[in-house]
Regions:
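Nucleic-acid nuclease catalytic cores
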Residues: 74-166
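Metal-dependent nuclease catalytic cores that hydrolyze phosphodiester bonds in DNA/RNA
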Residues: 1-84
Length: 166
């Protein structure tokens, strides 16, 4: 069963450089995700990680919004709709059920983020608010509200399925 990020990969393609995401940034993002999850579980903010600014930004977001997470790095799939995904966070922000996706890019790709969060909302199958959380290297963050766009996600599904036919 394909993942949401596999289905939406077309939105992340860099037409200028002819590739997807840079491996360095992908690895950095993975590390930040792991350390933010550790912080959620332990309440301890690690230091000396090489990504301390991103972690400070996440801690500041948590201080400012006081989210109540029901799920952290939540793996979900649905055979009936034919895809799966790992949702960074699901829980309550400002009293509303939300899906939050963490981004570490200096300029998040909003089309890709919209497609990704829409896929996650479809999987969760509950009324939710969608957010991207941009964590910045210097310790700032930006909470980005996203409107679900099912036409965009379905277009990604069509491209994905066409790519499977050879």
């Amino acid at each position: 069963m394909p993942s949401v990020t596999t289905i939406t990969r077309f939105c992340s393609y860099d037409s200028v450089n002819g590739n997807g995401s840079n491996p360095f940034y992908r690895e950095r993002g993975t590390l930040v995700h792991e350390l933010c999850a550790d912080y959620d579980f332990t309440g301890e903010l690690p230091t000396g990680t090489g990504v301390d600014g991103f972690l400070k930004a996440y801690a500041d977001f948590k201080r400012d919004y006081r989210p109540k997470w029901d799920y952290i790095e939540y793996m979900i799939g649905n055979a009936d709709i034919g895809f799966a995904g790992t949702l960074d966070r699901v829980g309550y922000i400002d009293g509303q059920l939300a899906i939050l996706d963490i981004k570490t890019a200096s300029k998040p790709n909003l089309v890709a983020l919209t497609a990704q969060l829409t896929g996650y909302a479809w999987l969760l199958d509950k009324p939710v608010i969608l957010y991207g959380l941009q964590l910045q290297k210097k310790g700032d963050y930006k909470l980005i509200p996203i409107q679900a766009d099912y036409e965009l996600f379905k277009a990604c599904q069509v491209l994905h399925k066409k790519g499977l036919k050879k």
